[in-house]
Swiss-Prot record:
UniProt-recorded name of the protein: Protein enabled homolog
Outcome reported for the amino acid change (mutating residue 255 to A): No change in subcellular location nor colocalization with vinculin at focal adhesions nor with N-WASP at the leading edge. Loss of cell mobility function
UniProt gene name: Enah
Species: Mus musculus
Modified residues (Phosphoserine): 144, 255, 383, 738, 740
Compartment annotation: Cytoplasm; Cytoplasm, Cytoskeleton; Cell projection, Lamellipodium; Cell projection, Filopodium
Chain positions covered by the region annotation EVH2 block B: 674-691
Skewed-composition ranges (Pro residues): 431-464, 542-553, 561-605
Function: Ena/VASP proteins are actin-associated proteins involved in a range of processes dependent on cytoskeleton remodeling and cell polarity such as axon guidance and lamellipodial and filopodial dynamics in migrating cells. ENAH induces the formation of F-actin rich outgrowths in fibroblasts. Acts synergistically with BAIAP2-alpha and downstream of NTN1 to promote filipodia formation.
Length: 802
C-alpha cells in the first residue's frame, strides 16, 4: 500500500448531532484516539483516520477534499464538515492541535496546488478566517485521480522531503509528550508517596502523643495516689498523736486523782464539826443541816466515791478561757475549778468498794457522769465555809475561806500531809450521805451556829461562791435551818472566782459560773492527797444541802428561798434538763419550823478570813467595798448572758433576800427601787448631754450616735441593774468564757423577771425610752444631713467662684 502517515495527534473525535443540536462522541464512547492524516502517494489524496487508544476502534475515516474549510474554533478544538456530517477534534494539548492543523494545511495546499498558487493562498486565508460551523456550499467528494504531473506546483521530491520533516517533528513531539507523561506520573507517584509518608508520620506522632498523655496520666494518678496516701498517713499520725495526747492527759488526771480517791476510800469516820469552826465568826454555817437517817459507817462514803467510767475531763479550751480570765482580772483568789476540785477520779474505774451498810436502791443519781453543763451554777444562800488552798506561787493575795455547797455523792477527804512546798493543794468537802433504809446513828453534835444577821438590814452582795447560786435549787434552807438533805442527781462543782470575778477579795463574785472556770490549777487542787491535819487554817464545814440537777444551757433558774411554813417543792425545770430531784423532807418533828431566811452573806474579805475579824458588824462595809470594787470593773467585757434573765430567780417569794440576785448577778437590788430610778435618771441625763452636743462638728456627732447606740442595746439590763454605778458592759462572765462579749436583751420569762418590792421592773419605761432615743436619733440625723448638704453647697460654690 502506498499510503503514509504525515501526522499523528491525540484527540477526542466528536460528531455534531443536528437533531439534538449538540456534540456527541464518535463511535458512541468517550475517550482519546490516535488521529492520523494519511497521504496516498499514488493518486495524491489525503484522508483522516482515527482509532481509539484503548480498543483501537475506528471512530473517523473521511477523505480530505479539495477546497475543504478547516475551522480552528479554539486552540484545542478544530472542526470541519464533509457531505455527510460535521467532525470535531478535541485535542489533548495545544501541541497536538498545532501539529494536526499544520498537516491539514499542508494537505489542502497539495490538493489546491493543482489549480494555481493563488487558489492555495486563498484557501489558506479562508481556512484561517473561518470561525463558525461551515456555512458555505457542501464541497463535492473528490474521487477522481489527480494527474501525475502537477502544473506550476512543488515537485514530488519536495513533497516527500516535507512529509519526512513533518513525520520527524511528529516523532519528536510524541517522544516529548511521552517524556512529559512519564514525568507527570512520576510526580504523581512521588506526591502520593509523600502524602503517605506524612500520614504515617502524623499517625506515629498521634500515637506517641497518646502514649505520652497516657504515661503522664498514669504518673499524675500515681502522684495523686501517693499524695493521698501521704495525707492519709499524716492524718492517721496526727490522730494517733491526738489520741496519745488525750490518753496521756487522761492518765495524768487519773494518776493525779488517784491519791485523793485512795485517801477517800480509806478515810476515817467523820471528824467532829466542832473542830471545823473558822478562826472568827464566819458566815452562818449549816451546823444543823445534816441528814436525819445517816449511817456512821465509813464505807458508805467510799461507795458514793466511786465514779462511773463515763466521767469525762473538760476540754482544753475551758482551761484556756479560765486562765485568760484569771490573768486579766488579777484576782487574789486562785481559780477553784468545778470540774476538777469537786470529784476525784479513781485510778481504777471498775473499783467500787462494797458497803457494809445497805444503800437505798433509789440512788441512781449518785452514779451519773460528772461532765456538768455550764448552767449548773446558780445562787444559793451561804453554806459552810471551806478553805481552798491554791497551788504555791499562783495565788497573789491572802487566800479566802470560800463557802461551798457540795453534792452528797462526794466523799469527805481528810487533809493530806504530802502537799508540796508546805502548802496544801487539796479541797476538803462536807458530805451529805444518802439516806439509808433504817435509822442510823446520829452524826457528831454540830457546834452552835453563829446568830444570823438581823433581817431589817438591806441584803448585802452575795457570797463570793458560785456554787451558792445553784445549790438551792431544791429550796435549800438558809443557814441554821434544820433540814435533811437528799442525794441529788448531779454532783455540784466548786467554781472559780476567776470567771468574771473581781480583782480583789473585796469584790463580790459572780453568782453564776460557766465552763470557763475549768483550768489546770483546779486539777492540782483536787488531786493532792489529803490525810493530815489541815494547814494554813483549813476549815471544814458541816454537810451542805445537795445541789439541784444540771439545767440546760438556756435560762439558769436559781432556787427561791423557802417561806417560813416549810420548804416548797423545787421549781419546774425545762423539758430539756434531767428530772428534778425529790424535794427535801420536811423539818424533823423534834425541831422547830425554819425561821424566816436571813439575807445572804456578804463576800468574805481576805483579811477578815485569815485574821479572824469576820463578824456581823462589818458586812455593810463589805457591801460598800463591793460597790467600790464593782465600779473598777466597768470596762470588763462580758459574755452574752441574755439567756439568764434576772439572774435566775425562780421563786415568787417577796422577801428581801430573794431579790438579792435580781440584777443579772451584778449585786443586790436596793430596797425601794432607788437604784432603778437612779439608773434611769443617769440614762436620761446622758441622752440630754448627747442632744446638747449634737450641734458640734461632724465627728462628734458620729461619736454621739455611737454613745446613743449603747443605751439602746443595754436598755433591758439597765432597767434591772441594781447598782447605780453599773454600766451595760459590767456584767461578769456568766456563760461560756470562749464566746465573745455580746450585750443582748434578756428574754422575759414569768419565773425569772426581776422585781423590786414585788413590782415587775422589766419593761417599766422601755417603750418611752425607746421612743425618746429614736426621736433624738432622728433629730441628730436630720441635723447631720442638713450640715452635710450645706457643706457640699459651700464647696460647690467655692469651686464655681474659683
Amino acid at each position: 500500500m502506498s499510503e503514509q502517515s504525515i501526522c499523528q495527534a491525540r484527540a477526542a473525535v466528536m460528531v455534531y448531532d443536528d437533531a439534538n443540536k449538540k456534540w456527541v462522541p464518535a463511535g458512541g464512547s468517550t475517550g482519546f484516539s490516535r488521529v492520523h492524516i494519511y497521504h496516498h502517494t499514488g493518486n495524491n489524496t489525503f484522508r483522516v483516520v482515527g482509532r481509539k487508544i484503548q480498543d483501537h476502534q475506528v471512530v473517523i475515516n473521511c477523505a480530505i477534499p479539495k477546497g475543504l474549510k478547516y475551522n480552528q474554533a479554539t486552540q484545542t478544538f478544530h472542526q470541519w464538515r464533509d457531505a455527510r456530517q460535521v467532525y470535531g477534534l478535541n485535542f489533548g494539548s495545544k501541541e497536538d492541535a498545532n501539529v494536526f492543523a499544520s498537516a491539514m494545511m499542508h494537505a489542502l495546499e497539495v490538493l489546491n496546488s493543482q489549480e494555481a498558487a493563488q487558489s492555495k493562498v486563498t484557501a489558506t486565508q479562508d481556512s484561517t478566517n473561518l470561525r463558525c460551523i461551515f456555512c458555505g456550499p457542501t464541497l463535492p467528494r473528490q474521487n477522481s485521480q489527480l494527474p501525475a504531473q502537477v502544473q506550476n506546483g512543488p515537485s514530488q521530491e519536495e513533497l516527500e522531503i516535507q512529509r519526512r520533516q513533518l513525520q520527524e517533528q511528529q516523532r519528536q513531539k510524541e517522544l516529548e509528550r511521552e517524556r512529559m507523561e512519564r514525568e507527570r506520573l512520576e510526580r504523581e507517584r512521588l506526591e502520593r508517596e509523600r502524602l503517605e509518608r506524612e500520614r504515617l508520620e502524623q499517625e506515629q506522632l498521634e500515637r506517641q502523643r497518646q502514649e505520652r498523655e497516657h504515661v503522664e496520666r498514669l504518673e499524675r494518678e500515681r502522684l495523686e495516689r501517693l499524695e493521698r496516701e501521704r495525707q492519709e498517713r499524716e492524718r492517721e499520725r496526727l490522730e494517733q498523736l491526738e489520741r496519745e495526747q488525750v490518753e496521756w492527759e487522761r492518765e495524768r488526771r487519773m494518776s493525779n486523782a488517784a491519791p485523793s480517791s485512795d485517801s477517800s476510800l480509806s478515810s476515817a469516820p467523820l471528824p467532829e464539826y466542832s473542830s471545823c469552826q473558822p478562826p472568827s465568826a464566819p458566815p452562818p454555817s449549816y451546823a444543823k443541816v445534816i441528814s436525819a437517817p445517816v449511817s456512821d459507817a465509813t464505807p458508805d462514803y467510799a461507795v458514793v466515791t466511786a465514779l462511773p467510767p463515763t466521767s469525762t475531763p473538760p476540754t482544753p479550751p475551758l482551761r484556756h478561757a479560765a486562765t485568760r480570765f484569771a490573768t486579766s482580772l488579777g484576782s487574789a483568789f486562785h481559780p477553784v475549778l468545778p470540774h476538777y476540785a469537786t470529784v476525784p477520779r479513781p485510778l481504777n474505774k471498775n473499783s467500787r468498794p462494797s458497803s457494809p451498810v445497805n444503800t437505798p436502791s433509789s440512788q441512781p443519781p449518785a452514779a451519773k457522769s460528772c461532765a456538768w453543763p455550764t448552767s449548773n451554777f446558780s445562787p444559793l444562800p451561804p453554806s459552810p465555809p471551806i478553805m481552798i488552798s491554791s497551788p504555791p506561787g499562783k495565788a497573789t493575795g491572802p487566800r479566802p475561806v470560800l463557802p461551798v455547797c457540795v453534792s452528797s455523792p462526794v466523799p469527805q477527804m481528810p487533809p493530806s500531809p504530802t502537799a508540796p512546798n508546805g502548802s496544801l493543794d487539796s479541797v476538803t468537802y462536807p458530805v451529805s450521805p444518802p439516806p439509808t433504809s433504817g435509822p442510823a446513828a446520829p452524826p457528831p453534835p454540830p457546834p452552835p451556829p453563829p446568830p444570823p444577821p438581823p433581817p431589817p438590814l438591806p441584803p448585802p452582795p452575795l457570797p463570793p461562791l458560785a456554787s451558792l447560786s445553784h445549790c438551792g435549787s431544791q429550796a435549800s434552807p438558809p443557814p441554821g435551818t434544820p433540814l435533811a438533805s437528799t442525794p441529788s442527781s448531779k454532783p455540784s462543782v466548786l467554781p472559780s472566782p476567776s470567771a468574771g470575778a473581781p480583782a480583789s477579795a473585796e469584790t463580790p463574785l459572780n453568782p453564776e459560773l460557766g465552763d470557763s472556770s475549768a483550768s489546770e490549777p483546779g486539777l492540782q487542787a483536787a488531786s493532792q492527797p489529803a490525810e493530815s491535819p489541815t494547814p494554813q487554817g483549813l476549815v471544814l464545814g458541816p454537810p451542805a444541802p445537795p445541789p439541784p440537777p444540771p439545767l440546760p444551757s438556756g435560762p439558769a433558774y436559781a432556787s427561791a428561798l423557802p417561806p417560813p411554813p416549810g420548804p416548797p417543792p423545787p421549781p419546774p425545770l425545762p423539758s430539756t434538763g434531767p428530772p428534778p430531784p425529790p424535794p427535801p423532807p420536811p423539818p424533823l418533828p423534834n425541831q422547830a419550823p425554819p425561821p424566816p431566811p436571813p439575807p445572804p452573806a456578804p463576800p468574805l474579805p481576805a483579811s477578815g478570813i485569815f485574821s479572824g475579824s469576820t463578824s456581823e458588824d462589818n458586812r455593810p462595809l463589805t457591801g460598800l467595798a463591793a460597790a467600790i470594787a464593782g465600779a473598777k470593773l466597768r470596762k470588763v467585757s462580758r459574755v452574752e448572758d441574755g439567756s439568764f434573765p434576772g439572774g435566775g430567780n425562780t421563786g415568787s417569794v417577796s422577801l428581801a433576800s430573794s431579790k438579792a440576785d435580781a440584777g443579772r448577778g451584778n449585786g443586790p437590788l436596793p430596797l425601794g427601787g432607788s437604784g432603778l430610778m437612779e439608773e434611769m435618771s443617769a440614762l436620761l441625763a446622758r441622752r440630754r448631754r448627747i442632744a446638747e452636743k449634737g450641734s458640734t462638728i461632724e465627728t462628734e456627732q458620729k461619736e454621739d450616735r455611737n454613745e446613743d447606740a449603747e443605751p439602746i442595746t443595754a436598755k433591758a439590763p439597765s432597767t434591772s441593774t441594781p447598782e447605780p454605778t453599773r454600766k451595760p458592759w459590767e456584767r461578769t462572765n456568766t456563760m461560756n468564757g470562749s464566746k465573745s462579749p455580746v450585750i443582748s436583751r434578756p428574754k422575759s420569762t414569768p419565773s425569772s423577771q426581776p422585781s423590786a418590792n414585788g413590782v415587775q421592773t422589766e419593761g417599766l419605761d422601755y417603750d418611752r425610752l425607746k421612743q425618746d432615743i429614736l426621736d433624738e436619733m432622728r433629730k441628730e440625723l436630720a441635723k447631720l444631713k442638713e450640715e452635710l448638704i450645706d457643706a457640699i453647697r459651700q464647696e460647690l460654690s467655692k469651686s464655681n467662684t474659683a
